[in-house]
Amino acid sequence: MFSKSMTIEQVDPDLWRAIQGEVQRQEDHIELIASENYASPAVLQAQGTVLTNKYAEGYPGKRYYGGCKHVDIVEQLAIDRLRALFNAEYVNVQPHSGSQANAAVYLSALKPGDTLLGMSLAHGGHLTHGAPVNMSGKIFNSIAYGLDPETEEIDYTELEQLAHEHKPRMIVAGASSYARVIDWQAFRKIADNVGAYLFVDMAHYAGLIAAGYYPNPVGIADFVTSSTHKTLRGPRGGVIMAKPEHEKALNSAVFPQTQGGPLMHVIAAKAVAFKEAASPAFKDYQKQVIENARVMARVLQQRGLRIVSGHTDCHMFLVDLRAKNLTGREAETALETAHITVNKNAIPNDPQKPFVTSGVRIGTPAITTRGFKELESEQLANLVADVLEAPTNEAVLDQVAREAQALCAKFPVYGN
């Protein structure tokens, strides 16, 4: 029999120290990685419940195990809330990640060798959109579209030309480092003209979409997937939304074709996050996320840095570091020393290797969760610029670290 009084610290002190180190890092470092956020205490609590003990292969009302009365309620809550949040018809909340949700979509609608038209990884796409190193680029005939070299926005003319030339079975829209509004209707029109499915991966934009600050692709695309962290601020996981005629194929693609038992504790945490995302406070939060990103981009431009495409419409943007004779890897290392966390990121047509890069990606979901507004975002952008101007100056790095820690202390992630 277990005692509820037993703690991780008592059972596994080595693991406890690692966890506490990460707790401290999250509290005293400013997080600017666009794909990261802080889950609420309620989301964390749901994910740490006894629901982790329950196997529930199948779907609510049709399980392969007994004892699923309560987990059926949990999963149905998540389903109903997700459906309402995005005005979806069919939803599946079981994918363990956004990438697995994408794999299930491909498995449900494509055959090996079918042509897939997705955004180039080098221009801001995602690995799972047909990159050669990913299974989506190995199993399917992957063709990539990209950005207009002048505007650094999606080149819809090229997209249409490629679609007519290659006649893809599926066109993928969505990105991992694209700061502008994506025209879902333009994608729909092109897909219809060549008889292709339209699949949207909205993982980065889901929270903004839920709040009404970014166009909703649900109902336009045949398939929509998302991760549940990032701007949606839930647990790490994935979801699928689609037109109802794809329900049977998608359910089968998730279980039993790509997954076994669903993670019921994670689905519970998703349900909490979906409820939080339907609140007025969440709408206000997403508005602030965009405002903070725009402030940071503007200040960095004023400090002599180039922002890819010149502007942002969402929670993130790319900074071109070539004018500073600095690589993304060098910038990432210097900023981390100064208690500011970013990720190195390729810019369009980047001459550097993927582990080096010529840019960094900056996102504001996490700092906005802390409570940063325009004033703090302006201060932070200037701190980032200070580091990028003197990445090896220890005095500058120490001063920026002190100011960053002061901001963190003023805006703790998890208060008392």
Swiss-Prot record:
Q: Which cofactor does it need?
A: pyridoxal 5'-phosphate
Source organism of the structure: Nitrosomonas eutropha (strain DSM 101675 / C91 / Nm57)
InterPro entries the UniProt entry points to? PyrdxlP-dep_Trfase (IPR015424), PyrdxlP-dep_Trfase_major (IPR015421), PyrdxlP-dep_Trfase_small (IPR015422), Ser_HO-MeTrfase (IPR001085), Ser_HO-MeTrfase-like (IPR049943), Ser_HO-MeTrfase_PLP_BS (IPR019798), SHMT-like_dom (IPR039429)
Q: Which reaction does it catalyse?
A: (6R)-5,10-methylene-5,6,7,8-tetrahydrofolate + glycine + H2O = (6S)-5,6,7,8-tetrahydrofolate + L-serine
User: For site (Plays an important role in substrate specificity), what residue positions does UniProt give?
Assistant: H229
Q: Which family does it belong to?
A: Belongs to the SHMT family.
Protein name in the entry? Serine hydroxymethyltransferase
This protein's pathway reads: One-carbon metabolism; tetrahydrofolate interconversion; Amino-acid biosynthesis; glycine biosynthesis; glycine from L-serine: step 1/1
Q: Which GO terms describe its molecular function?
A: glycine hydroxymethyltransferase activity; pyridoxal phosphate binding
Residues bound to (6S)-5,6,7,8-tetrahydrofolate: L121, G125, H126, L127
**Keyword Transferase annotated:** yes
Q: Where in the cell is it found?
A: Cytoplasm
Q: Which residues form a coiled coil?
A: none
Q: What is its EC number?
A: 2.1.2.1
Residues with PTM N6-(pyridoxal phosphate)lysine? K230
Ordered alphabetically, the record's keywords are: Amino-acid biosynthesis, Cytoplasm, One-carbon metabolism, Pyridoxal phosphate, Transferase
Quaternary arrangement and interactors, per the entry? Homodimer.
GO BP: any one term:
glycine biosynthetic process from serine
As for what it does, the entry says: Catalyzes the reversible interconversion of serine and glycine with tetrahydrofolate (THF) serving as the one-carbon carrier. This reaction serves as the major source of one-carbon groups required for the biosynthesis of purines, thymidylate, methionine, and other important biomolecules. Also exhibits THF-independent aldolase activity toward beta-hydroxyamino acids, producing glycine and aldehydes, via a retro-aldol mechanism.
Q: Which GO terms describe its cellular component?
A: cytosol
